[in-house]
Amino acid sequence: MQCALYDAGRCRSCQWITQSVNEQLSAKTADLHRLLAGLPVEQWCAPIGGPEQHFRNKAKMVVSGSVEKPLFGMLHRDGTPVDLCGCPLYPASFAPVFSALKPFIARAGLTPYNVARKRGELKYLLLTESQFDGGMMLRFVLRSETKLTQLRAALPWLRAQLPQLRVITANIQPVHMAIMEGETEIYLTDQQALAERFNDVPLWIRPQSFFQTNPTVASRLYATARDWVGQLPVRHMWDLFCGVGGFGLHCATPQMQLTGIEIAPEAIACAKQSAAELGLTRLHFQALDSTQFATAQGETPDLVLVNPPRRGIGKPLCDYLAQMAPRFIIYSSCNAQTMAQDIRHLPNYRIQRVQLFDMFPHTAHYEVLALLRRL
């Protein structure tokens, strides 16, 4: 992939950009083999890739500059701003949104936050696009609620320019730290969730719910999990760290009993909405800590699917799963190193199959799906 920002030395986020996609996949596959060395794997499935550019459905932009000439992008460690509107990872549909937002910021009087001076209001712009219908969610991350009245007053102009903006919010992040969002979310539109659809499964994206940033590869990840589960004798399943329910909603059948657990209430609200649309009455989603939920149960499901954050599921949950001994475990991971550590704490399981998904091209990161069978 050719990138003018990288060539000019202004951005180094895509550290592997000089390698071909095939070279990147080979290196990632070798890394996964290294991490799983000593763990018997019955089947290595071919890695899954996707587009090398224009694949991201989300932009996280630091806002700097002035209210008359705002700049969207990032700040180097020395405070130097870099305009990332031309980043080739973004789809072409983002460009008109960035173009309209620059004069809008002046109209609304949203002074960009100055990190050095600790002054200003607008810290970040967070933009998400649905691949289903092109609808978008825009979040203004503000230092305070001071400019809310001005923002509301100026919104009709912005919505006339950009009718694809279905969900608009103001997130309040008052802390002088590089934290992307605060706890308070104020909706500026009637619609509060963005509709998405993978493999004919309805999904919903809310402001504070995690959603994969590479829809093409994510849809194949979910479809693969569905295929694997469909080949197994599963009537009762847990989906831990379930997020908006992507895995569980794909894997569930009308006859299957499935419980999805996620600590974020916003994500659980999305999952429940999707389950209702699908008419799956035996799916139950709850906003709880996954480890605390699992260790408090007295029953053993046929299969436990885990999709933890980068830190992995941790030894306490590994120990409990080893003791509870479900027949199957599916582990989806964005950090193969912690996944390998966790699997080593499950000595009574063998990896039946494993597959790499190149969710993050031009970086060393990747997603992995592993099916474990009890010995």
From Swiss-Prot:
<feature type="binding site">
    <location>
        <position position="212"/>
    </location>
    <ligand>
        <name>S-adenosyl-L-methionine</name>
    </ligand>
</feature>
<feature type="binding site">
    <location>
        <position position="241"/>
    </location>
    <ligand>
        <name>S-adenosyl-L-methionine</name>
    </ligand>
</feature>
<keyword id="KW-0698">rRNA processing</keyword>
<keyword id="KW-0411">Iron-sulfur</keyword>
<dbReference type="InterPro" id="IPR010280">
    <property type="entry name" value="U5_MeTrfase_fam"/>
</dbReference>
<dbReference type="GO" id="GO:0005506">
    <property type="term" value="F:iron ion binding"/>
</dbReference>
<dbReference type="GO" id="GO:0051539">
    <property type="term" value="F:4 iron, 4 sulfur cluster binding"/>
</dbReference>
<dbReference type="GO" id="GO:0070475">
    <property type="term" value="P:rRNA base methylation"/>
</dbReference>
<keyword id="KW-0408">Iron</keyword>
<dbReference type="InterPro" id="IPR029063">
    <property type="entry name" value="SAM-dependent_MTases_sf"/>
</dbReference>
<dbReference type="InterPro" id="IPR011825">
    <property type="entry name" value="23SrRNA_MeTrfase_RlmC"/>
</dbReference>
<dbReference type="InterPro" id="IPR030391">
    <property type="entry name" value="MeTrfase_TrmA_CS"/>
</dbReference>
<keyword id="KW-0479">Metal-binding</keyword>
<feature type="binding site">
    <location>
        <position position="3"/>
    </location>
    <ligand>
        <name>[4Fe-4S] cluster</name>
    </ligand>
</feature>
<protein>
    <recommendedName>
        <fullName>23S rRNA (uracil(747)-C(5))-methyltransferase RlmC</fullName>
        <ecNumber>2.1.1.189</ecNumber>
    </recommendedName>
</protein>
<comment type="function">
    <text>Catalyzes the formation of 5-methyl-uridine at position 747 (m5U747) in 23S rRNA.</text>
</comment>
<feature type="binding site">
    <location>
        <position position="11"/>
    </location>
    <ligand>
        <name>[4Fe-4S] cluster</name>
    </ligand>
</feature>
<feature type="binding site">
    <location>
        <position position="87"/>
    </location>
    <ligand>
        <name>[4Fe-4S] cluster</name>
    </ligand>
</feature>
<comment type="similarity">
    <text>Belongs to the class I-like SAM-binding methyltransferase superfamily. RNA M5U methyltransferase family. RlmC subfamily.</text>
</comment>
<dbReference type="Pfam" id="PF05958">
    <property type="entry name" value="tRNA_U5-meth_tr"/>
</dbReference>
<dbReference type="InterPro" id="IPR030390">
    <property type="entry name" value="MeTrfase_TrmA_AS"/>
</dbReference>
<feature type="binding site">
    <location>
        <position position="262"/>
    </location>
    <ligand>
        <name>S-adenosyl-L-methionine</name>
    </ligand>
</feature>
<keyword id="KW-0004">4Fe-4S</keyword>
<keyword id="KW-0808">Transferase</keyword>
<feature type="binding site">
    <location>
        <position position="307"/>
    </location>
    <ligand>
        <name>S-adenosyl-L-methionine</name>
    </ligand>
</feature>
<dbReference type="GO" id="GO:0070041">
    <property type="term" value="F:rRNA (uridine-C5-)-methyltransferase activity"/>
</dbReference>
<keyword id="KW-0949">S-adenosyl-L-methionine</keyword>
<feature type="active site" description="Nucleophile">
    <location>
        <position position="334"/>
    </location>
</feature>
<keyword id="KW-0489">Methyltransferase</keyword>
<feature type="binding site">
    <location>
        <position position="14"/>
    </location>
    <ligand>
        <name>[4Fe-4S] cluster</name>
    </ligand>
</feature>
